[in-house]
């Protein structure tokens, strides 16, 4: 049973044969009474438990070797930290599931924490997917590509890389070394002569048979071997081939091998610190300071440093290095492949259990260790130094951000420094492909996982009507917010320091003047929340020069700020970020419209048939010229579908 299966077998206390006592959460004693009632019915077996409040929100997810013994600790009612006391006080009911082993419990716990994001657990933040290198496996001439997201495409994946830039640089060097194609399948099928990449020796030209199928397959195998960690073997084979070509006086071929070797050396030398004898490992280091935590991760694959990334998990300051790092690791590898070796700067709780769980997930042995000396210790020390520096920068930025937010509150007459600021902007060209954008900022800077874009879709909006677009954006944003979160102050958002990032904004900034503000105010009035949200319009001066902005607020005449006011610079940064995001979203939508395939307009042609047609004919234009009989030669295209396609392209003729 894997974590995904376990995640679907959660036993609710109300749905099981046990009758769970429900109690209020007004006092700490009430919470203890609920837990004491649950303990009587818990088995002495491994499993996972969930603590739930009166609203049905999961407060905490925990695992246990023995559910009964673990939950009994909460029933004592005394001797707990403030965090645990608050959690117990809010607990209205508990749910549990029994697992076969403690390893399964650990995997399930990590799965549930990532999915449910309980307020009292250690939580990963900024968990963007990592980019990988993909060698496609469903084509006679596999290509090499950058890939991010679900691994739905057949092929071999290599990574993770810390950034898209690292992937791009590596692919660029691998093109020089292995001459693999990077074109799409449709472009590959439509080529009649080699492209520029062939001319500059970045591709071997399999599209026009400039290389045999067998020789290209050899290049693909060498690339796989290199990316799989057998770089020394690959380089030795190429060096041998270069020597043989040189001895045969085939100096042109020897020069090709020489250039390939140089490209491989560039891949390995360009990645910074590259330890000897460490083919595949992840290095984690944790540093805690000022109530915050930084975990620095370095990725080593094929003996190369593929980059690093800093994480700042949400954790109770009272928790130690081991507990935070252990919880982080379980969540980190919940949806990522594990390397064979994981090096840590600090020991973690249940380290052997963690290694066992990761081994079970990977299907092979995964070693988790804290090196005490040697080159591996140097790696963890290097990662720890990076963690210290990253957290130092973050603390400095947070302090500066806090001062700016306090200044913002004073300037605009807010009751307190805003915890959540939303900034709105629109982008379009003559009303086409109109997009509304919302960016979010808070005490820790921009919160990019909260950004939202709104494709303007109302048929009643006149093209170019910025006020109408803003009304639609406001209506959709706040109507949905009310539906999902309720009104602010009704208890839907936790009020203690462990609360997650607030859903309701304390302040909204609109890129526009009085007209935009009137549109926004109309929607807020219609929804009955005009008194709950402070809205400010930010308009550029007559000459649209930065520094001459005019501000519009309800109940105040338009006003300006001194040119060198730090709050003015801060507002400009917020507005510019919203503008950047709006323009980027608009360009993406416009690009999507521009590359829209004519086959998308034919009813009955889904992704599978579209892919088969393009693979057979190469381009949509070639499909449009094909006869019915030619179309029927494509797998999955019946006579009726072939006539449908033919008629679509010839109906006006």
Swiss-Prot record:
One of its GO terms (molecular function) is excinuclease ABC activity. Residues 44-122 form the GIY-YIG domain. PROSITE patterns: GIY_YIG (PS50164), UVR (PS50151), UVRC (PS50165). It is found in: Cytoplasm. Gene3D superfamilies: 5' to 3' exonuclease, C-terminal subdomain, GIY-YIG endonuclease, UVR domain, UvrC, RNAse H endonuclease domain. SUPFAM superfamilies: C-terminal UvrC-binding domain of UvrB (SSF46600), GIY-YIG endonuclease (SSF82771), RuvA domain 2-like (SSF47781). It holds the Pfam family UvrC_RNaseH. Residues 232-267 form the UVR domain. InterPro entries: GIY-YIG_endonuc, GIY-YIG_endonuc_sf, GIY-YIG_UvrC_Cho, Hlx-hairpin-Hlx_DNA-bd_motif, RuvA_2-like, UVR_dom, UVR_dom_sf, UvrABC_protein_C. PANTHER family: UVRABC SYSTEM PROTEIN C, UVRC/OXIDOREDUCTASE. The UvrABC repair system catalyzes the recognition and processing of DNA lesions. UvrC both incises the 5' and 3' sides of the lesion. The N-terminal half is responsible for the 3' incision and the C-terminal half is responsible for the 5' incision. Belongs to the UvrC family. This is UvrABC system protein C. The lineage of its organism: Bacteria, Pseudomonadati, Pseudomonadota, Alphaproteobacteria, Hyphomicrobiales. The gene is uvrC.
């Amino acid at each position: 049973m894997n974590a995904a299966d376990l995640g679907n077998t959660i036993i609710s206390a109300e749905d099981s044969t046990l009758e769970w006592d429900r109690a209020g959460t007004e006092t700490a004693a009430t919470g203890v009474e609920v837990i004491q009632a649950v303990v009587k019915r818990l088995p002495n077996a491994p499993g996972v438990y969930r603590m739930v409040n009166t609203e049905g929100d999961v407060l905490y997810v925990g695992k246990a070797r023995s559910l009964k013994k673990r939950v009994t600790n909460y029933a004592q009612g005394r001797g707990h930290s403030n965090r645990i006391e608050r959690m117990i006080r809010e607990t209205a009911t508990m749910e549990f599931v029994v697992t076969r082993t403690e390893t399964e419990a650990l995997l399930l716990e990590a799965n549930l924490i990532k999915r449910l994001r309980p307020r009292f657990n250690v939580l990963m933040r900024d968990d963007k997917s990592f980019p990988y290198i993909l060698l496609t496996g469903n084509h006679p001439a596999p290509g090499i590509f950058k890939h991010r997201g679900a691994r739905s495409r057949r092929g071999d994946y290599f990574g993770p890389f810390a950034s898209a830039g690292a992937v791009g640089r590596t692919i660029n060097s691998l093109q020089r070394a292995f001459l693999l194609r990077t074109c799409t399948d449709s472009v590959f099928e439509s080529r009649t002569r080699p492209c520029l990449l062939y001319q500059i020796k970045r591709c071997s030209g399999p599209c026009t048979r400039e290389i045999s199928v067998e020789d290209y397959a050899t290049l693909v195998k060498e690339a796989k071997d290199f990316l799989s960690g057998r770089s020394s073997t690959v380089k030795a084979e190429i060096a041998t081939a270069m020597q043989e070509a040189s001895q045969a006086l085939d100096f042109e071929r020897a020069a090709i091998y020489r250039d390939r070797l140089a490209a491989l050396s560039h891949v390995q030398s360009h990645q910074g610190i590259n330890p000897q004898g460490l083919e595949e490992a992840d290095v984690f280091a944790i540093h805690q300071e000022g109530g915050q935590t930084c975990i620095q991760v370095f990725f080593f694959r094929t003996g190369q440093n593929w980059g690093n990334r800093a994480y700042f998990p949400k954790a109770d300051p009272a928790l130690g290095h081991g507990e935070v790092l252990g919880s982080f690791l379980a969540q980190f590898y919940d949806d990522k492949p594990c390397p064979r070796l994981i090096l840590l700067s600090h020991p973690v709780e249940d380290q052997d259990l963690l290694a066992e769980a990761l081994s079970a997930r990977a299907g092979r042995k995964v070693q988790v260790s804290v090196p005490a000396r040697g080159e591996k210790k140097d790696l963890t020390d290097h990662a720890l130094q990076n963690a210290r520096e990253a957290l130092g920068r973050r603390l400095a930025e947070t302090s500066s951000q806090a001062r700016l937010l306090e200044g913002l509150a004073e300037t605009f007459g807010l009751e307190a420094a805003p915890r959540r600021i939303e900034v709105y902007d629109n982008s379009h060209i003559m009303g086409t492909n109109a997009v509304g954008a919302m960016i979010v900022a808070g005490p820790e800077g921009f919160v990019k996982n909260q950004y939202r874009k709104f494709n303007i879709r109302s048929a009643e909006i006149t093209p170019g009507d910025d006020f109408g677009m803003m009304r639609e954006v406001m209506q959709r944003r706040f109507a949905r917010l009310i539906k999902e979160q309720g009104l602010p102050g009704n208890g839907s958002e936790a009020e203690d320091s462990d609360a997650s990032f607030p859903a309701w904004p304390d302040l909204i900034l609109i890129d526009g003047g009085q007209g935009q503000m009137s549109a926004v105010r109309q929607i807020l009035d219609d929804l009955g929340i005009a008194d709950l949200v402070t809205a400010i319009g930010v308009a550029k001066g007559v000459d649209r020069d930065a520094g001459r902005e005019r501000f519009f607020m309800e109940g105040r005449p338009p006003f300006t700020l001194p040119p060198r006011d730090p709050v003015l610079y801060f507002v400009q940064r917020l507005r510019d970020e919203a503008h950047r995001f709006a323009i980027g979203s608009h360009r993406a939508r416009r690009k999507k419209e521009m590359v829209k395939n004519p086959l998308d307009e034919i009813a009955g042609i889904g992704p599978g048939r579209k892919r088969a047609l393009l693979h057979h004919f190469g381009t949509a234009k070639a499909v449009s010229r094909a006869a019915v009989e030619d179309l029927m030669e494509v797998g999955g295209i019946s006579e009726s579908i072939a006539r449908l396609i033919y008629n679509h392209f010839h109906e006006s003729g």
